[in-house]
Amino acid sequence: MAQNNSDGVEGASPAKRRRLDQVTYSEICADFRSGSFSDFFMEKYNFAQVASYKMQPDDDWTDMIAQHAKIELDPTKEYVILSTVFIQSNCYIIGHGAKIVIVGEPGIAFKVLTKSFGPVITNMWAVSFTDCVFQRRDSYNGKVFTCASQVLFHNCFFVGFTGTCITSTAALTVRGCQFLACYRPIMFLAAFDLTVKHCVFDKCVIAISTEGDFEISSNLCTDSCCFLSAAGTGIFSYNSIVNPFTLQDSAEFSMVTCADAKVQLLHTIHIHSNPKLVYPQFMHNVLLRAKLFVGRRRGGFHPHFCSLKYSLLTLAKGSERKVNLSTCYPDGLKVYKVLNRNPNRLFTRLCECDASHQTADIVLGEVGLPATADPTLDSVDCLEFSSDEEW
């Protein structure tokens, strides 16, 4: 007959079974400093074993994260950030839907620094925030996060920030998050990878601005000035961009960009010119009343199975022969190419670099749909527009 014990082995009663999270982060750090880890990269502990600390609103964020690493927030309480929170080690913040309110002078609410030397815990490889709601108060217009180490945001909600929500110079992953009425949700300044999946951007000015490689997939952007300003390259797939205004109405509010050393009007999706980079992979996207700018790069720009309904495509000089729309659905699409500038008509606009630039009016010329098939010769009832199961 199995013998009852308190170690959670077979035969123990449910009341006496031990939970996995019985090791505190302080004990793990002490074990690491004692030299019992045979190797720095040895993952002796996993996420489920680390005891979580239920944080109180009056606790010091910097100290609690350094001491406990695995933090739980109370959804019935409100957590107010009055000064910058410094994070220098891997941690895991479980929000449970709790509100984190940022007040005070403009600055940085959370500053993720370069990680210090410490233990490696399985499934706690980065700074992670999950199920947190971030709000601002008292006209706070600073940044929410600046990240110098890898950070993961999972199912978080940012609302009403007039500054940049997340600025990163390291690998960044944003999954299942929502950004409502934010000026710039994501600004990626690293040469690493940016991953944004299953997110919602509503009523934002510049949703994603990236200088590095990216994978942006399965997102929804509505009523925003710019969804993606891409100076780098990567994968852009399965996204939906919906603008409730017509192209004439959206022209009343416009911004510019100087990312490619030329001041251009900022489009909903803006692929900057760079002769050293290839075009991003552009697949299975739906654009409704959106603006797409295609700069000059290496190779060709061939959107696959994208719906470009009542949208505007602007081609930079030298890129008009690089675009192929033969596998798209361009109903109501208008295509223009940049001809020259009118020096007699100058205007000043706010730039995505947060400065204001004066530029000459750009003269555009309307062109036909580039590289589309002849409907009298090429049938759409073919393998190109079908799945494997249909053949």
Curated annotation (Swiss-Prot):
* Record flagged with keyword Metal-binding: no
PTM annotation (Phosphoserine): residues = 387
Q: Name one Pfam family in it.
A: Adeno_E1B_55K
Q: Does the keyword Ligase apply?
A: no
- UniProt-annotated location(s): Host nucleus; Host cytoplasm
Which residues, by range, are in coiled-coil regions? Answer: none
Specify where it is mainly localized: host cell
UniProt record, GO biological process: symbiont-mediated perturbation of host apoptosis; symbiont-mediated perturbation of host ubiquitin-like protein modification
Q: Which UniProt keywords apply?
A: Early protein, Host cytoplasm, Host nucleus, Host-virus interaction, Modulation of host cell apoptosis by virus, Phosphoprotein
Name the job this protein performs.
Answer: Plays a major role to prevent cellular inhibition of viral genome replication. Assembles an SCF-like E3 ubiquitin ligase complex based on the cellular proteins ELOB, ELOC, CUL5 and RBX1, in cooperation with viral E4orf6. This viral RING-type ligase ubiquitinates cellular substrates and targets them to proteasomal degradation: TP53/p53, LIG4, MRE11-RAD50-NBS1 (MRN) complex, ITGA3, DAXX and BLM. E1B-55K probably acts as the substrate-specific adapter of the SCF-like E3 ubiquitin ligase complex.
- Show the domain comment: Contains a PML interaction motif that allows the subnuclear PML localization.
Question: Family per UniProt?
Answer: Belongs to the adenoviridae E1B 55 kDa protein family.
Subunit = Interacts with host PML-4 and PML-5; this interaction promotes efficient subnuclear targeting of E1B-55K to PML nuclear bodies. Interacts with E4-ORF3 protein. Interacts with E4-ORF6 protein.
Q: What is this protein called?
A: E1B 55 kDa protein
Please give the organism.
Answer: Tree shrew adenovirus serotype 1
